[in-house]
């Protein structure tokens, strides 16, 4: 009886297993294959990226079922009643990033044929990471890309040249345009301002130049704007203050000039602001920073702003990093910086004309990992404990302040940093006694005159 029950259970299990296999097999067989035009275009792109790999023999079947990592498909139904749609390539990522993203590897001779991308009507993402490093490749004309594209990414391609050409405004679905560390040049086309779905525009580390005349008013969804390390010039774009969703603004290492736009105070969600190393001048540290409570990092170094450090820190307790190096600051460091900036990790005030003492409150900045006060006119005793100095180590930079001093106990502690370059505070003065001797003729004569005068008074 037990044997019969066991046999019955085994038969039932086998039946369901067979049914599952048949269902899966039927599903696979019933799925439509990727069309030949897209399949062939993928092969050709892979071969242009790395011709040493036999892509066709490694992946001879439907690329929507078996494809290299980085090639992704999705199924699209032409009507709501269809259970299985038509497959299309939706993502292509090239260039090995890591073991977690083993995209098809590129070679120094990788190239690209932009005409091939017209074969992909549902392409959403296109990424090239460190692919074009030796062979010169011209940036593809945007007119070859379909309006379905949401992400266009080129990172670390020094041989990628040319400009943003074509009718870029046709990419109406574009959310992220990331061109970082390439050799793309020219000006930003006005058509970028029509990409109303854009959330990230990163053009850093290229050779763009000219004034930024881009109309930003329509980019209501923009969260990241990074134009750093290019050759942009002129005034900073005035409409920046209208980008209400902006979280990061980086214009550093360009040739922008004039005053820092006051309408930046309208960026209530902004967390990262970097305007360092431009030509902004004679406007002081912006007072409107006090009206931007979401700020976590603000870097203004390398601009001749001038003036004193303002008292604006009581509403900015969340700030983690402040860069005010080489901006022409004068006057004292306000103690309010130490009182309110309790979460501060980095503070750069070096290469200015600051004077007075380092505020005692700085000694209580427990989160600081780097503090640079080099090359100012600071004086007096440093307010740091041995524990503080040991924690910050070599990133506590105090050199170039001749009148700054450290206590002997702090100097003798086994801590690193620039304390060893400071003079000792309260160095004891050893009195110099002059003994009366035959060699001290001037002093001897003086005492004799006093003695004679005393006798004269007594008489």
Q: Residue ranges of each PLM-predicted region?
A:
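Leucine-rich repeat
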Residues: 119-123, 142-149, 157, 169-174, ...
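Surface-exposed cap/linker segments adjacent to membranes
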Residues: 2-6, 10-77, 90-99, 130, ...
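Right-handed parallel beta-helix
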Residues: 129-186, 190-205, 209
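Consensus "Asn ladder" position of solenoid repeat domains
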Residues: 131, 157-158, 182, 203-206, ...
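The feature encodes a structural signal of leucine-rich repeats
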Residues: 111-115, 136-143, 161-166, 185-190, ...
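Tandem repeat domain/solenoid detector
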Residues: 173-175, 181-199, 204-223, 228-247, ...
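Membrane-proximal ectodomain caps of single-pass cell-surface receptors
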Residues: 267, 271, 280-283, 289-297, ...
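LRR N-terminal entry segment and analogous cap-like coil->beta motifs
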Residues: 79-162
């Amino acid at each position: 009886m037990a044997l019969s029950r066991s046999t019955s259970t085994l038969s039932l299990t086998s039946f369901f297993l067979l049914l599952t296999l048949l269902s899966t097999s039927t599903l696979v067989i019933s799925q439509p294959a990727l069309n030949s035009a897209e399949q062939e275009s993928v092969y050709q792109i892979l071969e242009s990226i790395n011709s040493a790999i036999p892509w066709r023999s490694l992946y001879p079947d439907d690329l929507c079922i078996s494809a290299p990592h980085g090639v992704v498909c999705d199924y699209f139904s032409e009507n709501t009643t269809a259970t299985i749609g038509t497959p299309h390539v939706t993502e292509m990522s090239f260039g090995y990033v890591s073991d977690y993203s083993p995209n098809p590897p590129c070679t120094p001779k990788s190239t690209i044929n932009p005409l091939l991308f017209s074969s992909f009507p549902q392409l959403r993402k296109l990424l090239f990471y460190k692919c074009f490093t030796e062979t010169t490749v011209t940036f593809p004309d945007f007119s070859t890309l379909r309006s379905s594209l949401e992400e266009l990414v080129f990172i670390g391609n020094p041989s990628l040249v040319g400009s943003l050409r074509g009718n870029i405004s046709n990419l109406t679905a574009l959310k992220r345009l990331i061109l970082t560390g390439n050799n793309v040049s020219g000006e930003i086309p006005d058509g970028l301002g029509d990409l109303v779905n854009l959330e990230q525009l990163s053009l850093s580390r290229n050779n763009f130049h000219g004034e930024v005349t881009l109309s930003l008013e329509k980019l209501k969804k923009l969260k990241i704007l990074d134009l750093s390390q290019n050759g942009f010039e002129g005034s900073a774009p005035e409409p920046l203050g209208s980008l209400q969703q902006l979280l990061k603004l980086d214009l550093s290492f360009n040739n922008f000039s004039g005053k820092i736009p006051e309408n930046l105070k309208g960026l209530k969600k902004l967390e990262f602001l970097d305007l360092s190393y431009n030509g902004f001048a004679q406007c002081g540290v912006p007072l409107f920073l006090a009206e931007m409570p979401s700020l976590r990092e603000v870097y203004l170094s390398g601009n001749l702003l001038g003036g004193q450090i303002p008292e604006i820190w009581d509403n900015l307790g969340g700030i983690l990093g402040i860069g005010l190096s080489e901006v022409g600051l004068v006057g004292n460091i306000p103690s309010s910086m130490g009182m309110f900036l309790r979460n501060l990790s980095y503070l750069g005030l070096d290469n200015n004309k600051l004077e007075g003492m380092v505020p005692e409150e700085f000694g209580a900045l427990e989160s600081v990992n780097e503090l640079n006060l080099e090359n100012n006119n600071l004086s007096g005793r440093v307010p740091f404990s041995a524990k503080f100095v040991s924690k910050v180590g070599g990133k506590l930079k105090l050199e170039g302040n001749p009148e700054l001093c450290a206590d002997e106990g702090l100097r003798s502690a086994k801590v690193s940093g620039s304390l060893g370059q400071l003079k000792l505070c309260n160095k004891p003065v050893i009195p110099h006694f002059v003994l009366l001797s035959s060699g001290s003729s001037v002093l001897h004569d003086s005492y004799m005159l006093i003695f004679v005068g005393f006798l004269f008074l007594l008489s």
